[in-house]
Amino acid sequence: MIKQYLQVTKPGIIFGNLISVVGGFLLASKGSIDYPLFLATLVGVSLVVASGCVFNNYIDRDIDKKMERTKNRVLVKGLIAPSVSLVYATALGIAGFALLYIGANPLAMWLAVMGFVVYVGVYSLYMKRHSVYGTLIGSLSGAAPPVIGYCAVTNEFDAGALILLAIFSLWQMPHSYAIAIFRFKDYQAANIPVLPVVKGISVAKNHITVYIVAFMIATLMLTLGGYAGYKYLIVAAAVSVWWLGMALRGYKTENDSVWARKLFVFSIVAITSLSVMMSIDFSATAAPEALMTYVW
């Protein structure tokens, strides 16, 4: 029973989000870590993400049964009653928001609320099922965790927070489109209007390339803005160029599914690498003037 309640929270997604939370938190901490704040932020975000995932499982149970990769989910198989899952999701969310408000700051909590509302209320309930732009809207919620981690420390939404929002939002797009390509038949069977299904895989490849270029530019802004150091810059440039190269090879591939799966796997490597590097190669003297120095 415990295993089922854990599975419905999507532990893999929680873990992936926590890596980005740590990146944002340590970037803002600049080597001076408030451990009680750190713990409250990690647990608070974990609870909110878990809540969102349970709500998503509840909302998607009708389409999950049509998809090969989701047909064995807990709610689809009836291992947890839908009404119970709603109570569970609500309890997780309330606990998470309360912990962020009390243990971090109101800004961190409100950022979590906004990410939650976008994911559950806008993306899961409507956009995912009705619009090709669902992925774009969903990317905003996916970018919330590192921003929450950052703002838990700074207690303000500054240029650094905005850059993190841009990096992680832009990353979500090729990452998600790659999944939609190698899971094309699943999305088609469930009638989910993702870009590769609606516009075609060739169009999706163009979008993937453009978003990776934009992602590359956004990642460099952390150093140009004085928030991260040159070691981070080198890694960011390297993974971005490699990821772009993989995307470009997609135009010549004979097997879109294999190519997309490789692109997806590397997307995880890329964002994890950036999260680690911003955690350890922060700039101790980040200032708005730094960006102007590079520009001029």
From Swiss-Prot:
Extra information: Carbon 2 of the heme B porphyrin ring is defined according to the Fischer nomenclature.
Q: What is this protein called?
A: Protoheme IX farnesyltransferase
**What's the family?**
Belongs to the UbiA prenyltransferase family. Protoheme IX farnesyltransferase subfamily.
Any Gene Ontology CC annotation? plasma membrane
User: Which keywords belong to this entry?
Assistant: Cell inner membrane, Cell membrane, Heme biosynthesis, Membrane, Transferase, Transmembrane, Transmembrane helix
Superkingdom to which the source organism belongs: Bacteria
Stated role = Converts heme B (protoheme IX) to heme O by substitution of the vinyl group on carbon 2 of heme B porphyrin ring with a hydroxyethyl farnesyl side group.
On whether Transmembrane is a keyword of this UniProt record, the answer is: yes
HAMAP family according to UniProt: CyoE_CtaB
Tell me how this protein sits in the membrane. Answer: Multi-pass membrane protein
The pathway this protein participates in, as annotated, is: Porphyrin-containing compound metabolism; heme O biosynthesis; heme O from protoheme: step 1/1
Name its species: Serratia proteamaculans (strain 568)
InterPro entries named in the record: Protohaem_IX_farnesylTrfase (IPR006369), UbiA_prenyltransferase (IPR000537), UbiA_prenylTrfase_CS (IPR030470), UbiA_sf (IPR044878)
Can you state which reaction this protein catalyses? heme b + (2E,6E)-farnesyl diphosphate + H2O = Fe(II)-heme o + diphosphate
